[in-house]
């Protein structure tokens, strides 16, 4: 939703009203869908994986009475927990076009996409401190994860997302029948205090029943997810618009480094032109942001 109008007149971009209001959670949901499509294509992860991880995480949050801005930030982190997957894939494919991506992602280079992902989300407008949530979301409670951090060194949100992530991956790999809930409970019990900390295991078993767990196999969970998350539109300045566009660029452009360079190059040229024409710094930011956003909107519709 925007109260800003922009149009081009004789080579000049004219901006009207100043406010740009964006539903950042909805934007994260759209980004999650793009990531899911790529994961389904490359590593055979189930569709809507990010949204399921977010739903499981939001449900678990009830155990700690997490609400408001903190709940919104947890949902965003969960939706975008694998935001650097495409960036990592792109770099690995440049090195070796025949690598086994599924094996490579799961066994050897998990820490890289966590590092990239942590850096990427600094561009997004979180309301609370989410430092190290993405970085440590693959850590094990006993300290055997990629960074060898034990559960008491890991942010709660990272621990929640880690359990939710594994739950959905396992749920997708087993038959969805009457025995799947019992299998999951047994798995959590066997890996309590090793893969997962006992507090998160208790939280999951406290909020989920066999019936609610089985509902993860259909699309009804998505409606419940959006009902549970606070959805407040944020007023974006033009610098934030550019940061968000940069974040999307790393995902949308993973198959072609040219499209990424092209849209960034166009934005840079627009900035130079606006400065040459004597516009102030705010108008220059608007020009760059609008050009960036339009470029990615065009590519997303192709």
Predicted features along the sequence, with ranges:
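Alpha-helical phosphate/pyrophosphate-handling elements in metalloenzyme active cores
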Residues: 43-74, 139, 145-153, 256-287
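Conserved beta-strand-loop-short alpha-helix elements that form
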Residues: 159-171
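Histidine/acidic-rich helix-loop-helix segments that form or flank divalent-metal centers
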Residues: 17-18, 74-78, 121-162, 176-177, ...
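Active-site flanking loop/helix segments enriched in acidic
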Residues: 30-49, 95-101, 245-261
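An active-site-proximal "capping" alpha-helix that borders the catalytic cofactor pocket
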Residues: 52-61, 113-121, 180-192, 196, ...
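Short, Lys/Arg-enriched N-terminal segments with co-localized hydrophobic residues
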Residues: 1-15
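Signal-transmission coiled-coils
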Residues: 24, 39, 80, 157, ...
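Conserved small/polar residues in nucleotide/adenosyl-binding loops
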Residues: 291-298
């Amino acid at each position: 939703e925007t109260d800003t109008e922009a149009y081009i007149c004789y080579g000049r971009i004219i901006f009207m009203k100043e406010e740009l209001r964006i539903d950042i959670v909805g934007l994260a949901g759209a980004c999650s869908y793009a990531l899911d499509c790529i994961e389904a294509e490359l590593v055979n992860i189930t569709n809507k994986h990010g949204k399921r991880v977010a739903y499981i995480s939001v449900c678990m949050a009830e155990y700690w009475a997490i609400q408001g801005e903190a709940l919104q930030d947890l949902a965003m982190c969960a939706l975008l927990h694998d935001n650097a997957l495409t960036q990592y894939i792109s770099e690995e494919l440049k090195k070796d076009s025949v690598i086994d991506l599924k094996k490579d992602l799961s066994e050897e280079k998990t820490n890289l996409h966590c590092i990239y992902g942590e850096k990427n989300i600094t561009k997004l407008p979180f309301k609370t401190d989410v430092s190290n949530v993405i970085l440590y979301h693959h850590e094990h409670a006993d300290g055997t994860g990629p960074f060898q951090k034990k559960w008491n060194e890991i942010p709660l949100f990272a621990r929640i997302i880690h359990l939710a992530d594994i739950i959905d991956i396992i749920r997708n790999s087993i038959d969805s029948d009457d025995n799947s809930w019992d299998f999951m409970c047994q798995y959590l019990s066997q890996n309590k205090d090793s893969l997962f900390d006992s507090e998160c295991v208790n939280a999951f078993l406290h909020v989920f029943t066999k019936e609610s767990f089985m509902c993860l196999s259909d699309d009804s969970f998505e409606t419940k997810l959006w009902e549970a998350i606070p959805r407040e539109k944020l007023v974006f300045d033009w610098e934030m618009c550019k940061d968000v566009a940069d974040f999307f660029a790393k995902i949308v452009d993973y198959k072609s480094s040219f499209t990424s360079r092209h849209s960034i190059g166009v934005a840079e040229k627009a900035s130079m032109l606006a400065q040459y024409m004597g516009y102030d710094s705010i108008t220059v930011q608007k020009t760059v942001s609008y050009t960036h956003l339009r470029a990615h909107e065009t590519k997303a519709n192709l």
